[in-house]
Amino acid sequence: MRTSHMLEQLMEALRCLPGVGPKSAQRMAFHLLQRDRKGGLQLADALSQSMTEIGHCAECRTFTEEEVCHICTNPKRQENGQICVVESPADIAAVEATGQYSGRYFVLMGHLSPLDGIGPSDIGLDVLDYRLRRGDISEVILATNPTVEGEATAHYIAELCREHQVEASRIAHGVPVGGELELVDGTTLSHSLLGRHKI
């Protein structure tokens, strides 16, 4: 079936979203045009405004409309001298949801991946190095993903911290709460055994 050029453009644009293939894009486009044109216009307006006005925090690199985000400007967040290094702004939301952390963050917007041509300056480690040199950070909590690239990135940052005499710690990895031991993969179980603590 031949569709209009504009409809094709809409479906192609929707496919830029993660997990949206041709069928899903077609379904979304038809829904917006057939049942929710007002919602479609709101979506278009919000997307347009967000793409032009949301940038990166000058301190932590998370998304914000301001020069410096609300977390970095909060004096209470600066008291303990901690920063938690994460790979994406979505990771900040996950850490914040725990209610267990009250420091500042640094967002890498990725991880080291030499095979893909992603080096230290591509993920802002030059900015992190500058922040460590300023002397207002006493501990860096490494909360990168437990992947090969995430571990390599954490190791690189730990070395940076050593150069600046700043304590570096890694979040624990292990058996999920409610998980069954026999179903846990070997790497996760190894991390759990190595990261055990006294009770």
UniProtKB/Swiss-Prot annotation:
It holds the Pfam family Toprim_4. Keywords: DNA damage, DNA recombination, DNA repair, Metal-binding, Zinc, Zinc-finger. Residues 81-176 form the Toprim domain. GO terms for biological process: DNA recombination; DNA repair. Transmembrane segments: none annotated. It comes from the Bacteria. GO terms for molecular function: DNA binding; zinc ion binding. A zinc finger (C4-type) spans 57-72. PROSITE patterns: RECR (PS01300), TOPRIM (PS50880). NCBIfam families: recR (TIGR00615). May play a role in DNA repair. It seems to be involved in an RecBC-independent recombinational process of DNA repair. It may act with RecF and RecO. Belongs to the RecR family. PANTHER family: RECOMBINATION PROTEIN RECR. This is Recombination protein RecR. It comes from Vibrio parahaemolyticus serotype O3:K6 (strain RIMD 2210633).
